[in-house]
A protein has these predicted regions:
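Conserved P-loop NTPase motor cores
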Residues: 1-6, 11-17, 24-81
């Protein structure tokens, strides 16, 4: 990814032991969806949505559209069965 994000925020539905290594490497973890409207636009952020299929509401749509475009955010959505 270029330019490299200044922050990586991993949003999860259920904590997994594998997250501990990522946390040691500086990844920020939050349970559920973040309140991106509170974030400043001066940082490049990568937001990863993991295991949040039940959170498919208007906040997810805004994160992918207005949130990413106007707040300097790139979004990845991890979906697996």
């Amino acid at each position: 990814m270029n330019p490299v994000p200044e922050e990586v925020i991993w949003c999860y539905g259920e904590w997994q032991l594998g997250y501990n290594q990522l946390k040691r490497e500086g990844v920020i973890f939050t349970e559920g969806l973040p309140k991106v409207e509170e974030w400043s636009t001066n940082k490049r952020r990568l937001v990863i949505l993991d295991d949040l299929m039940s959170e498919t509401d208007d906040r997810v749509t805004k994160l992918f559209t207005k949130g990413s475009h106007h707040r300097n955010i790139s979004v990845m959505y991890i979906v697996q069965n």
